Amino acid sequence: MSGKGAPELSVRNCGDLRVAVIAAQWHEKVMDGLVDGALRALHELGIDEPTLLRVPGSFELPVVAKVLAGRGYDAIVALGVVIRGGTPHFDFVCQGVTQGLTQVSVDTGVPVGFGVLTCDTEEQALDRAGIEGSHEDKGHEAVTAAVATAATLRSVSEPWR
């Protein structure tokens, strides 16, 4: 499983961060698990009023992330699922989403947690969705990474915190 070697992140003083979660709608069962994991992580971090927005698919995540980054959010979490099919569509969507979300983060300075599953099968996606029987919870992990990065950025600009 890919979770080997994952860091234990300690995040403090983040309850006042403005966080948005953007979730694609394809593969409903997987997405429900990712969203639940993300919202649970936010609650554990003391962020009880995040913005949750839905988009049709993963390819639409970057444009919404870009708009939100310009609206004062401290961190954005992008959740989606792309499952390989029999055409190159999978490769194009995965590359576009990954590059788009990276560009948003680098261009705006707003961390974007990458919770987009790129899997060969639905079973692989379910195993990472944070639902009962899953081995990983990528929604939770994406929130933790985004909020930890936002806290790091805040410590650089506000070292007295």
Swiss-Prot record:
Gene3D superfamilies: Lumazine/riboflavin synthase. Its EC number is 2.5.1.78. The keyword Cell membrane does not apply. Belongs to the DMRL synthase family. This is 6,7-dimethyl-8-ribityllumazine synthase. It catalyses: (2S)-2-hydroxy-3-oxobutyl phosphate + 5-amino-6-(D-ribitylamino)uracil = 6,7-dimethyl-8-(1-D-ribityl)lumazine + phosphate + 2 H2O + H(+). GO terms for molecular function: 6,7-dimethyl-8-ribityllumazine synthase activity. It is an enzyme of class 2 (transferase). It comes from the Bacteria. Pfam families: DMRL_synthase (PF00885). GO terms for biological process: riboflavin biosynthetic process. InterPro entries: LS (IPR034964), LS/RS (IPR002180), LS/RS_sf (IPR036467).
